[in-house]
Amino acid sequence: DICMIYHADMYLMPGALDSIEEHLTDKTIVSLTRIEPPLHPDGPEKILMDFGVEPEEFKETELLEWFTKPIDSTGGYQPKHDNPTEGIFAPWAFYKKDFQEIGGHDPLYAPQSKEDSDIFNRFQLNGIKFIQTWEGCVYHMTCRGSRRNTVDKAKNIYEDSPEWLAQNQRSTRNFIRKWGHFVKHDSLMKPIIPSKYDIGIVLDNNNMELLHALEP
């Protein structure tokens, strides 16, 4: 069985599923390339192009016209890489057996934040190869779920909601406790997993404020 982790604020572009089927083999995970409005900095792993941030302003017709132009035409979709790259970010497609083999998502991070980085690390340690196809894409409005959702008390689409900030802090501390470091990846979103050592600090005259600062 093939499954996919997919965000609610993503729009599947033509040919995306065909590209997944082309590249998905045993012990691989295939990510689609994200086309995003410029809410976050640009990077070598995605395409910045503004076709709307909110569903109500989504310019679907303009997006499809831009995307379906020949790749060598002026003003159309231009992949940043000629060949698939090695990285992982939503949406990602995988075989159900590979997901079950590592126990799925760790409930430590429920309801959200850092659960994706955690499972990416575990996939990599279990021998999974990551493939990002540049022939298959999604349009990603970004942060329309909870992070910058004004319905969830975010002041605007450029500021994180209080609920997301609090949960992100909890999940970040749990990630550091589990892995011994903060989330790390290369410029193309392939996980970097440093070695973890059994170390500790002995404190004298301790208090809760100091413990909170030193122990994640």
Regions found by a protein language model. Name each.
Residues 7, 140-142:
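Histidine-centered active-site/metal-ligand motif
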Residues 15-32:
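Conserved donor-nucleotide/metal-binding helix-loop-beta segment in metal-dependent transferases, i.e.
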Residues 8, 34-35, 135:
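Active-site loop/turn elements of alpha/beta-hydrolase fold enzymes
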Residues 2-11:
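Short beta-strand-to-loop acidic/aromatic patch adjacent to the donor-nucleotide binding site
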Residues 20, 86-94, 98-103, 109-137:
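A short, conserved alpha-helix in the catalytic core of glycosyltransferases
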Residues 15-19, 118-122, 170, 174:
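Alpha-helical elements of Rossmann-like donor-binding domains used by nucleotide-donor carbohydrate transfer enzymes
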